Amino acid sequence: MQKFEFFEHTADIGIRAYGRNLNEAFENAAVAVFEVMTDTSKVEPKEMREVKIDGYDLENLLYRWIESLLVYYDSEIMLFSKFYVNIDEKNLTLEGKAWGEKFDPNKHERRTVVKAMTYHEMKIENKGNYYILTFVVDI
C-alpha cells in the first residue's frame, strides 16, 4: 500500500494519506506534508519533538497534529522525516513524536513551504482494513 499521494488543487496542495490503521495514516499524512517542503529521505532523525493534543473529532485531531508540526517548522526551521502517533479515539487525544533535524540549505532541497493546514476537502475514511485521510494544505 502506498503511504500517500498528492492531488490537483488550485493554488494549494491536496494530500491523500493511507494507513493500515488510523495511527499509521496520521504518520503518513505528516510525511506527505514534509515531502511537499523537502526530500524527506535526506532528513536525518537527529532530534525528537513531542506533540500532545486533544480534539473534538478526528478531523480536528488531524488538523491540530499537522498544525503542531508546522509550528516547529516555523519556529525552529525543523524538518521531520519519521513519526510515531498514538490516537485514543474514545477520548479524542493524540500523543505523537516527530524526528528530524533543522533545515540545512547545503543538505536539504528547498521545495514549496506549507503555510498552514486547512479543513478544505478534509475527510477521514475507514475502509475496514485501511484508512484514507484526505486534506488540503495552504502553500
Swiss-Prot record:
Q: Which SUPFAM superfamilies match?
A: MTH1598-like
The protein in question is named: Protein archease
Provide the residue positions that the database annotates as binding Ca(2+): D12, D138, I139
Query: Which InterPro entries would you find in this protein's record?
Result: Archease, Archease_arc, Archease_dom, Archease_dom_sf
What GO annotations for molecular function exist for this entry?
calcium ion binding
Task: Name the job this protein performs.
Answer: Activates the tRNA-splicing ligase complex by facilitating the enzymatic turnover of catalytic subunit RtcB. Acts by promoting the guanylylation of RtcB, a key intermediate step in tRNA ligation. Can also alter the NTP specificity of RtcB such that ATP, dGTP or ITP is used efficiently.
- Gene3D superfamilies listed in its UniProt record: Archease domain (3.55.10.10)
Q: Which family does it belong to?
A: Belongs to the archease family.
Cited Pfam families: Archease
Q: Which organism is it from?
A: Sulfurisphaera tokodaii (strain DSM 16993 / JCM 10545 / NBRC 100140 / 7)
Q: Which Gene Ontology terms describe the biological processes this protein takes part in?
A: tRNA splicing, via endonucleolytic cleavage and ligation
Q: Which UniProt keywords apply?
A: Calcium, Metal-binding, tRNA processing
